[in-house]
Design a protein with these regions (language model features):
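Nucleotide and nucleotide-moiety/phosphate-recognizing core
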Residues: 1-110, 120-134, 141-147, 154, ...
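Hydrophobic alpha-helical segments within soluble ligand-binding/sensing domains
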Residues: 114-118
Length: 192
């Protein structure tokens, strides 16, 4: 990882207000937390998203909330990364994960989409899966026959929302370690 490159941190979600607080918008919620902690206003509109830039502990950072809807997230991320000449290994994606309990973090340096359509779109548009991601546990469907779309677009019950909020400081620390070139340490400290 080259320290001279800008970092892009993208939180995935759906843009309409009716999706606020939904499981699928865990990435938006995480990005909002980082923006608040780092004092970065995410209010510029371009690249089919809301974005802002700043500096975090010596790292130039662009924060992005794609407004393309989840399944087309790459249509926002790839053009912004191209504009700022950000290589894929400096694109950190924050997204929901239905295979993890609420609040659990799963940090990976790269990998498949694992059935996540937002990640599929990003992989297609960036031309590969070599970008770090922090997957945020939102819990599994309560029953195998439960409609997946209804589950991920559903709102968090209060106890699950608290489980996520309690992990935002860990997610922030993990993001900083990734930018410091210490992804392995982020995994060992914060996965789970």
């Amino acid at each position: 990882m080259n320290a001279n490159y800008i970092w892009l941190i993208a939180g995935l979600g759906n843009p309409e207000a009716k999706y606020d607080g939904s499981r699928h918008n865990a990435g938006f919620a995480a990005l909002d937390y980082l923006a608040g902690k780092w004092g970065i206003s995410v209010n510029k509109t371009k690249f089919q998203g809301l974005w802002g830039q700043g500096e975090v502990e010596g790292h130039k950072v662009v924060l992005l909330k794609p407004l393309t809807y989840m399944n087309l997230s790459g249509d926002s991320i790839a053009p912004l990364a191209g504009f700022f000449k950000i290589p894929a290994d400096h694109v950190v994606v924050l997204c929901d994960d239905i295979t993890q309990n609420p609040g659990k973090l799963r940090i990976r340096p790269s990998g498949s989409a694992g059935g996540h359509n937002g990640l599929k779109s990003i992989i297609a548009r960036l031309g590969g899966d070599g970008f770090p991601r922090i997957r945020i546990g939102v819990g599994a469907k309560p029953h195998p026959d439960y409609d997946l779309a209804a589950w991920v677009l559903g709102k968090f019950p209060p106890e699950d929302a608290k489980a996520l909020a309690d992990r935002w400081p860990d997610l922030e620390a993990a993001a900083k370690l990734i930018m410091d070139g210490k992804l392995g340490l982020a995994q060992s400290k914060y996965n789970g």
